[in-house]
């Protein structure tokens, strides 16, 4: 059967800001079995949950320590603790075009450690548009399921790429999911 999912708490935007602890609490209260959240790394190496590379005031997360961030931005550890009992899709945000790009993919190592500490691989999938980031995570812990995100191109090519990199799934950008693409 299909699992109920609450991407980033978006189903209750008026009640809680997405990617926050209150949003994950609400997701549980609404009966979500899975949530999706976005992971980024700070200057001091802490993985935090935030969609954008920059804060509203323009400061880049990767140039700030966790203590310099607004209080509403949780660490990934705090978020995973809050999500206990639910499955979690952790999207690692790490594109070369992002101002917080982590060329060494250290975020992958940190995420792998947090998954093992808080949830385990059976209640987790880690996704990213950056295949190198996913490859690094797989090298650190091959038991964690991975999903390749893609926004353009032929889904068959994305499937082939995901298979070549030992990934569990593909996650296409919403507009790419049509009846005809699903049938293929």
Predicted features, each with a name:
Residues 1-184:
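Phosphate-group recognition and catalysis centered on beta-loop-alpha active-site segments
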């Amino acid at each position: 059967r299909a699992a109920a999912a609450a991407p980033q708490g978006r189903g209750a935007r008026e009640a809680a800001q997405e990617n926050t602890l209150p949003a994950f609490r609400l997701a549980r209260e609404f009966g979500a079995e899975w949530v999706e959240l976005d992971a980024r790394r700070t200057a001091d190496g802490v993985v935090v949950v935030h969609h954008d590379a920059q804060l509203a005031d323009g400061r880049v997360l990767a140039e700030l320590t966790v203590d310099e961030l607004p209080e509403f931005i949780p660490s990934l550890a705090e978020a995973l603790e809050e999500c206990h009992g639910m499955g979690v899709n952790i999207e690692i945000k790490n594109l070369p075009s992002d101002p917080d790009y982590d060329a060494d993919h250290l975020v992958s190592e940190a995420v792998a450690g947090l998954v093992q500490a808080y949830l385990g691989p059976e209640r987790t999938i880690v996704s990213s548009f950056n295949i190198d980031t996913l490859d690094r995570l797989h090298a650190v812990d091959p038991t964690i399921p991975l999903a390749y995100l893609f926004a353009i191109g032929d889904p068959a090519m994305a499937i082939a790429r995901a298979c070549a990199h030992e990934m569990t799934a593909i996650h296409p950008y919403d507009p790419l999911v049509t009846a005809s693409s699903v049938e293929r």
